[in-house]
Amino acid sequence: MGHRLHVAKKYDVQYAAGDAFNYKVEEIHYLLDACCENNYPYTGDEHDDEFEVSKEDWLEMIEVIKYAYGLDSTITKNNYWVDIDCVRQSCINLVKDKDEPLTEGEVTNLLSDLQYFLDNSEPKESYLHLCFF
């Protein structure tokens, strides 16, 4: 099982800055699954360490997290029919090792880290190629 999440640019995987989501293979899949209509299940197989996510779904995940934490007043419940408690718990599991609510700063950092992977993906592709190693 992989350890650190990295993003591929032209299938030339670049080391990610920082240590966001290290050792969190299962947790990133659960967050994607909680936030996106498309399915990104965690199966426990070795191929879970390397996967692709559409940029549209990655953006949707960011927007759903903003909605779940009330950070964007332009997003309403009509935009997303998600289980807010499940989204928040998935965020907690991704960010912390303890089961306690995220602070506003932790949510901001999470969103910034997710945006980093989007910004550093291959601009010509419609998906992010992510891998843990």
Residue spans for each PLM region:
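Acidic (Asp/Glu-rich) sequence patches and key acidic residues
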Residues: 1-124, 133
